[in-house]
Design a protein with these regions (language model features):
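Long, charge-dense tracts
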Residues: 91-92
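Terminal, non-catalytic domain-edge segments
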Residues: 3-59, 64, 81, 85, ...
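Aromatic-lined, polymer-binding surfaces characteristic
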Residues: 68, 79-81, 96-257, 269-295, ...
């Protein structure tokens, strides 16, 4: 990759474009960090050497069986909107073109049963999650990725997605994994298992909504980040497909997006001035991936009116700097290591493996916005806690009752 990319975004044969715009430094840092995390996974999968070269670590060795699938699914899910922007004449556009080609080749190997890195298949129950994340990535990059896969690769993907129907999901956010897979099948084939598509949506709509944008993760309520990591982002993407195909439950979409807007405001308010956040519940090894919904709300432009896109960019940039400006979260071979901010394996649940850590990539969803978007163009702005602790104006927090 050309090092000149990290100096400034340029027209390939021209001078620096509008150097005065403050977005350049933030966006360059985001793309640089994306590469730092994603390139080892994609490049090795492209070469058929992911299983050979990827570091493996887990608090329970059983979870290593699907670590390679998890790593790729998480990376792809997070960078898909950036890929969907497609190539253009900027240096970043040229870089995206390389990553699109890298991803296409990686997917081809991942579904090829004759390849050393054949990883997209139903290995065990845990693989349902990763295949759902892979499917969500396909929905997020339909033009640049799905439409550019060969018909043979598309057919193998459809086959593997349908194979997940043998898995009975747990009665919690796992129901959305089956819904996501069926929504993807509906989008790409025009057919789906309607019960598997709608059952989880009905559960969250009718039984598990608690109020003020918070869903319970099944019959019992636990405090964690799963509303941001899985529930809201998946409901949003699933319901968009259901609305598109006039499936009744899709009527929830407008309300759901308003709930997501409210929950995004809650997430923005918990980012400290230092770029840290409360350590609540499971999956803290996903690191900045706990802000999946805040990133998606920025991508969808559904942030509340009292939160400027630039303050979200500024807050998330601080989080990224805290966790990834250095190399404390990588091993000596460039793979992510288990922990929150350093090697801290004790913080991991039994299901966590090296591949799980790449869920941090969902923070990169706003890279799917053009570099001319206000998210990137507007100057640095203090986020809520920074305003508050600097003694500046902060509006009261407003709950919702729908």
């Amino acid at each position: 990759m050309s090092n000149s990319f990290f100096g400034r975004f340029k027209k390939r044969d021209n001078k620096v474009v509008e150097e005065h715009l403050p977005i350049r430094e933030d966006r360059i840092f985001w793309v640089e960090t994306l590469q730092k995390i994603a390139f080892p996974v994609l490049n090795n999968l492209k070469k058929g050497s992911l299983k050979k070269n990827m570091s493996l670590e887990a608090s329970n060795s059983e979870s290593n069986k699907i670590a390679h699938l998890e790593a790729f699914a998480n990376v792809f899910n997070g960078i898909a909107p950036w890929l969907e922007l497609g190539p253009d004449e900027s240096e970043e556009g040229g870089l995206r073109e390389k990553y699109i080609l890298l991803t296409l080749k990686a997917i081809g190997n991942a579904v090829d049963s004759n390849n050393n890195d054949y990883i997209i298949f139903t290995e065990n129950k845990q693989s349902l999650m990763s295949i759902a994340l892979f499917a969500q990535g396909l929905l997020r990059s339909k033009t640049q990725i799905w439409n550019n896969l060969s018909m043979d690769v598309q057919a193998r993907i459809i086959y593997e997605l349908k194979n997940t129907r043998i898995i009975a999901p747990f009665e919690n956010h796992w129901l959305l994994f089956t819904s996501m897979i069926e929504a993807t099948l509906l989008e790409f084939t025009g057919e789906c298992d309607k019960e598997r598509l709608t059952y989880g949506v009905r559960k969250f709509r009718d039984e598990w909504y608690l109020g003020d944008a918070i869903y319970a993760d099944g019959p019992e309520f636990d405090v964690n980040y799963y509303n941001s990591i899985f529930i809201h982002p998946m409901l949003n993407d699933i319901l968009k497909i259901m609305r598109k195909y006039s499936i009744g439950e899709g009527e929830l979409l407008d309300v759901q997006l308003m709930r997501s807007s409210r929950y995004a405001s809650q997430l923005e308010r918990i980012i400290s001035p230092e770029g840290s956040y409360p350590l609540l519940g499971k999956s803290l090894t996903f690191r900045c991936g706990v802000f999946h919904l805040l990133s998606q709300a920025s991508l969808f432009k559904i942030l509340p009116r009292n939160i400027e896109p630039s303050q979200v960019r500024s807050a998330l940039t601080k989080v990224l700097e805290t966790q990834f400006e250095g190399y404390q979260n990588f091993d000596d071979k460039g793979w992510l290591s288990i922990g929150l901010n350093g090697h801290q394996i004790e913080i991991a649940e039994n299901c966590i493996n090296t591949g799980s850590l790449y869920a941090c990539c969902t923070i990169f969803l706003p890279l799917g916005l053009s570099f001319n978007d206000s998210f990137w163009v507007d100057p640095f702005e203090e986020w809520t806690t920074l305003k508050a602790w600097n003694g500046n104006l902060v509006e009261s927090d407003q709950s919702i009752d729908f």
